[in-house]
Structure formats: structure tokens, C-alpha cells
Amino acid sequence: MLRARRLGKTIPDYALTTCQHAIAGRSLLLDFDRSFGSTWRPCPRLEHLSREESSPGGGSFRTDLAVEAHEVLRQSMGPEIPGVNTRTDETDFGSITRVAVTTEQAARALGKAMGNYITIDAPELPLRDRELEREVSQALARELVGLIRANLNNADFWAIPNFTTLICGLGNWNATPDAIGPLVAGKVMVTRHVYSMTPPEKRGGLKSAAAISPGVLGLTGIETAEVILGVVGRVRPNLVIVVDALAARSVSRLGTTIQLGDTGIQPGSGVGNRRFGITRETLGVPVIAVGVPTVVHAMTIVADALSIMGQAPQGISPEQQGGPHGIRDIAGGSELPPAVSQMLEPYLGTLIITPKEVDVLAKELSDVVAGGINYALHPAIDEEEIYQYLQ
């Protein structure tokens, strides 16, 4: 019998309609039956937002990466998906993949909002090569500038007087895999407090920038979107950049991938703890999201292991493998069958995995992301000066 206790009082089952346990200290959200007379109401500008989206293809795996959702969908719908345009460019450090979701039908199938998503893949990024990190930061800056201009009707934001950017580092700074956002917020070059006092001829390539790390609901008792909405109303920025940790479907993407998008972000969605959205509709200004995958769901690892077990070496028949037919059948698809998922759900349903060196990854990746944002917003600053600032 599910019960919740507060101040020594017991709340019976029938009154408890939702109980979402936090991952990494996010929150414990209790929605009570109307008979208890709850008077809480969300912010009016946030009421229309949906709390949950289906995973691509109706599968059981969550991913925040549009490129992974597209890969899963292609396996069930074929290589050409109406309303989804993709392009991959090879680079010296890896690749850059662009996914454009152009129709509502494609957005529902993909489980992603309509818009543009850019994925930067650098498989050797965890090796802590400084030159490689600078290359990725510069690539991130170029893509970020392109997204900003596209969302400002191709306007040159560097030439707009008093153009102000608010950088929001989302996440729980007490949980290392979720600390990417706060770390980045502490490393970007903030200039808003001195920009207005600097003579125009001495501003050079600096733009007005401010940063905030609003924390999470479990730490502050305030929705992240509500904090940012209040700051936006006071600071009145022209652009908001949100940085957050993401959940991936593939272990190989942990610490090697950076995603940009112009659709905003749903904090906590990757670990099943979706909060109110931070989007252009809620804030009234363009919102660019930058995310780095740091966790993967345990169910994904199980599926990958079964897939490896089901792959027969070339020239050996399935019967000679010695494995049960069930495993080979399971390994035939990219996701676990519903029966297997239901069997594992009590044990692995909410379990997420992160690398043991995630503290090092978080520090290095926050340097890369902060460096890219600094490059994009302050083009006249010398490269060496930017990296000295990050030290």
C-alpha cells in the first residue's frame, strides 16, 4: 500500500494520484486528489505545456538526442521519414549531424518538437586533448552563431546595440552527472554588469552577457522555468541559452557528443522527471539549448548486451551458436520486446548509468561548452584569453 508521510500524518492511497521519485536528487512531486482542496496553480504562461512525450516509435528507451531518436525511427519506418531532413558532415574530429523536424506528424513520431537539432560527435573528446577541445569549441561556436542568426531572421546579432544574452546552467550542482549546466554557467564570460559602463569605442567584440544557475525543484522548491521566467522579465535579454545534461541511448555518446537545438528544453525529461518547458513560447524570446549526454538507461545496456549475444560470427549458423532462440529473437531488434521490458521493469525501470570518471568528463566538457559560448558571443576576444579565463 503506497503511503506518504508528512508531519506524522498518513495520506491514503486513493488521495495520491502521482508520485514521481527524483533521479539524482531532482524532486519528489506529489499531486493530490481534489478532495484535499489543493489550491496550487502553475504559472499561467506554463499551463499549456505537455508534461510527457512518447519515445520514438513507442519504444521503452528514453533519449534526449534527436539523432538517436531518428536512428530508432528509421529501423521501423525506413530510411526516408516524411518531415525529417538530415545531413551529416565529416570533420577532422568526428562529424556534425543536422536534423530538421518540419512537420507535426514527424515531431510526434520522433518524440521531439519541431525545429532544428545539431549533433557534434567527437569520439576522442574524453582523451583530454587540448587542441581537440579547442576545435570542438570553435565548431560549437560556429553552429551556435548559425542557430542564433536563424532564429533572429538572419540578423547579425553582433551588430545589434545592447544585445543581451542570458545563459542558464540547468541541473543539480550536488549531483556530478547533472552538474554540466552549473559548471558552464560559472565559466562563461559575463559582461552585462560592466557593458553599460564601457564606452562604445572600447567595447570591441564584447556583447552583454549574464549567467544564472537556477538549481532544481528539489533544492529550491521553485520550478526552474519559473525562476528563469522571472529573471527574463527583469533582465529582458534578447536571447536565452540553456545548458543541461542529457540522457543518451548509446553508451558511446557519453562524454563525446554535444547537441544544440532551437526548440528549448524540458528539464529532467531524459531521466523521466519532466518539468515545465523552457521554450520561446514560455519566455517570449528565442531559446537555444545546448546539451551533453552524461547518463544512459540501464535497459539500453541490457538490450545492447543481448544484441551482441545474438550476433553469430560469419559462417556459423544460429543453431551452432548454442544460445537460446529467445536471445537471438530479442537481439533482432533495436529495443526489447514488451514482454521482456515488463519483466525487467521492476529491477531496471528507473536505473540510470553514468561513467565512473564522470567528474573529469563534466569538468572537461564544461570547458568545451563554455569556450564555445564565449567564442560565439565575444568574437573579438583572443583564443588564448578565452582559455586563460576558463582555467
Predicted regions, residues:
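N-terminal amphipathic/basic leader segments beginning at the initiator methionine
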Residues: 19, 29-111
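Short glycine-rich or small-residue beta-strand-to-loop segments that form or flank ligand, phosphate
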Residues: 119-123, 164-174, 211-215
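Glycine-rich phosphate/diphosphate-binding loop of Rossmann-like nucleotide-binding domains
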Residues: 172-207, 211
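Gly/Ser/Thr-rich loops at beta-strand to alpha-helix junctions
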Residues: 170-178, 218, 245-249
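A structural-propensity feature for long, helix-poor, extended segments
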Residues: 204-231
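A structural signal for small-residue-enriched, beta-sheet-centric alpha/beta enzyme cores
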Residues: 212-213, 242-390
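An N-terminal, well-structured beta->alpha segment
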Residues: 104-152
